[in-house]
Amino acid sequence: MKTTLRNVFALTVMAAAFTACSDDDKKASSSFELIPSAFEGDIEDGEVVLDANTTYKLVGPLVVHTGATLTIPAGTVIEGVGGTGAYIAVEQGAKINVNGTEAKPVIMTSGNTTKNGGDWGGLVICGKAPINRGTVTAQAEVSGLTYGGTVTNDNSGVIRFLRIEYAGATYSADKEFNGLSFFGVGNGTVVENVQAFHGSDDGFEFFGGTVNTKNLVSFGNEDDQFDWTEGWSGTNENWYAKLSFGKGNRGIEADNYEFGYANTPISNPTIKNMTLVGPGSAADGTNFAENSALKLRRGTYGSFDNIVVANWKVGFDVENDETIAAVPSKLKGSNVLFASDVPAETKGKKTDGTTADVAGVVTSKSATATGAGAGVAKPTWANNWTTGL
């Protein structure tokens, strides 16, 4: 009996050791050399997990390559100090997991003493979902990574409670980073509770793909607060945008594709519960040169419901024949409230430059529309984890 018990005990210990080894194998460590004071390089394998008690100085490009994962725990701070060269990019087949919380968001910000939009690049994610450039794949305008494909449910990870501040550094003569750029990102990716704050270009931009989003805040970005092109077709809920800092353009700039207005798949997002607050209809025409809440052009479709628009020269600004033809069957806003100071609720311009009646783009108005949740005010879901509102 004693011998049998000893044998059973030995087998139990061996089994436990084997299980532990198997679990370790599932979470294989990476060969990446993690240096917090010089955070850059190529994550080519395994999983790199950051430490929330450490501040990471992003001095150059950090690229997560196919098969690798970058995991960022709640409360982690990453400071960009490398200007244009400092950005985080996620390659096709790689993943980023941002595990922030309302109390402890992950913060990607400027490491400069005096912080300004454009102090560092931003976050770039490349997926395998469809685009409409006429080729199955393409190279991202920032980072140069490949994006696009045929995988609508492609998964690039999970992003929750993330704040991106002072991004938008110039990448080339005519290209700038956005706060968060989605290149062909699929709807297997989770994006919830993200703020883009005071970047020098767009807050969020979607280049094709099918990614869905919830609870996005774009505040004080110096170009458009939201932008899409190349056939993006995500489903979205709760967007809040507000211009600030004395400079900016549209609430939304929306294209199908600049060089093929009818290219398929056609951009066709659905957005429910959105507030767009502008600089005022009489704002300075130099610093706020494109004073429209929604610029819908180049063949885009879209459906917008429960929308609050305030303080813009133009509300729904529809341009190009293909876009106008989509009104109101495939391009429309319902339950819209022009809360204050929107002298031109709609405006239309054909491709030849002549005017068009696009009043039908607003299919219904609602005096009780709440937009992102609280009319023009900060929605409650943005409490605690956002800044500037």
Model-predicted regions and their roles:
Residues M1-R6, L11-E40:
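Bacterial Sec-dependent N-terminal signal peptides
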Residues K27-T54, L58-H65, T69-L70, V81-G93, ...:
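Extracellular beta-rich repeat passengers
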Residues V77-E79:
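Short, charged beta-turn/beta-strand-edge "cap" motif at the junction between a beta-strand
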Residues P105:
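Aromatic- and Lys/Arg-enriched surface recognition patch
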